[in-house]
Amino acid sequence: MWNPRGQRVVVTGASSGIGAATAVEFARLGAVVGLVARRRQQLGEVLEACRETSPDSQIFVADLSDLEAIDGLVTTIIATLGQIDVLINNAGVPKRRKTSAVTVADAESVMRINYLSPVALSLAVLPTMRRRDAGHIVNISSMGAHMVSFGVGAYSATKAALEYFTEAMYVELAGTGVHAHVVVPGTTLSEFSTAKDGNDPPFRSDPKLAATPEVVAAAIVASLSDDRFITYATERDGATAASRNADPNAFLFSMRDRLAGLGR
């Protein structure tokens, strides 16, 4: 069983939603948390909650779309916290737009944050983890990588890319003390799923079927005690993915029939 007490855990996208809940949960369990996001005020509010149980936790304000600055960010975090034992790549942005309306600029911008940024962060922390022969990289994916919903093709593609990169790390790091895996949330009750500029309105879903950020945070913590590559945030998400993987064509036929007419 992995023990979080005293571990240095870095959480990106920690100013709200899953990231904030994850940071607070690790702090509650005794980890020293490094909170990374762009929004200083919101980060400060989450830091206050973390410091109630983890007084040495710190914030690092950063724009993760600036890939050239990521090595420097990691150097600063290590200098402040001492080392990084666990990296939770949670930061992400939505892109809700039909494929026929997506621009190359749309695709590039969402790929930069959702895929290239966690790749760059993973590559930046790997050398020190390999030297210590210890560490965890947890990349937060999405059910969108397993069942593309209407109007989120560009977003889903970024999460599928992240899963395959992480899968390669998982295999290549076998036999070392460094581990990489993904956690897959479905629809979550957070601002990520609300209306945003530059996006079509969120697809309507039953809020009773959505997970809370705290449920996802608990799944992230639990995944560190498991050797599996993929952890679904809820049993329902896992069952949906299993159904899709059992017969992708039948699953997509059913989805296409249910959504027929929305694309007109």
What are these regions (language model features)?
Residues K98-T99, T103-E108:
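Substrate-binding pocket helix/loop in short-chain dehydrogenase/reductase
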Residues V61-G72, V104:
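The beta1-alpha1 cofactor-binding region of Rossmann-like NAD(H)/NADP(H)-dependent oxidoreductases
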Residues R8, S15-S16:
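Conserved glycine-rich cofactor-binding loop
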Residues L29-V46:
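Conserved glycine-rich Rossmann-like NAD(P)H-binding loop of the short-chain dehydrogenase/reductase
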Residues V171-R236:
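SDR active-site lid
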